[in-house]
Amino acid sequence: MATILVDVVSAEASIFSGPAKFVALPGESGELGILPGHTPLITRIQPGAVRIEKEDGSEEFVFVAGGILEVQPQHVTVLADTAIRGTDLDEAKAQEAKRAAEELMQNQSSDLDIARAQSELAVAAAQLAAIARLRRKK
């Protein structure tokens, strides 16, 4: 079967680089599925799990806190604001981030502070959803 080269990078590090049969990730309008030969595309991505189906059929999960997706017919690049390997996700840390964001929303008065708290809450909720999804896969 044909493959597509996938690179998932953040400002801190390259998280994944290798061939894949399929990539799924959260786009602005819903879940995007990318196969080899896909039409070129550039779009923003939402916080959530990137699922990479490797050549051998195994899956790799990477949590991204938003970013940009570039698709070329034989190459997918995910430029993530923050990226964490699925195996490195910490549920307790994500729960604490969610609690802190909810508390921030209650105690903020300016629209900018509320928007920042909402963004942090969305990332924490997406991280918890990614953890739950990983548990179901095991």
Curated annotation (Swiss-Prot):
Main localization, broad class: membrane
Record's keyword terms, sorted: ATP synthesis, Cell inner membrane, Cell membrane, CF(1), Hydrogen ion transport, Ion transport, Membrane, Transport
GO MF annotation list: ATP binding; proton-transporting ATP synthase activity, rotational mechanism
InterPro entries reported for this sequence: ATP_F1_dsu/esu_C_sf, ATP_synth_F1_dsu/esu, ATP_synth_F1_dsu/esu_N, ATP_synth_F1_esu_C, ATPsynth_dsu/esu_N
Superkingdom classification of source: Bacteria
Subcellular location: Cell inner membrane
UniProt GO cellular component terms: plasma membrane; proton-transporting ATP synthase complex
Membrane topology note: Peripheral membrane protein
Keyword Transport: yes
Keyword set includes Ubl conjugation: no
Pfam families: ATP-synt_DE, ATP-synt_DE_N
Family, per entry: Belongs to the ATPase epsilon chain family.
Subunit note: F-type ATPases have 2 components, CF(1) - the catalytic core - and CF(0) - the membrane proton channel. CF(1) has five subunits: alpha(3), beta(3), gamma(1), delta(1), epsilon(1). CF(0) has three main subunits: a, b and c.
Function: Produces ATP from ADP in the presence of a proton gradient across the membrane.
HAMAP family recorded: ATP_synth_epsil_bac
Protein name: ATP synthase epsilon chain
Organism listed in the record: Cupriavidus pinatubonensis (strain JMP 134 / LMG 1197)
Record gene name: atpC
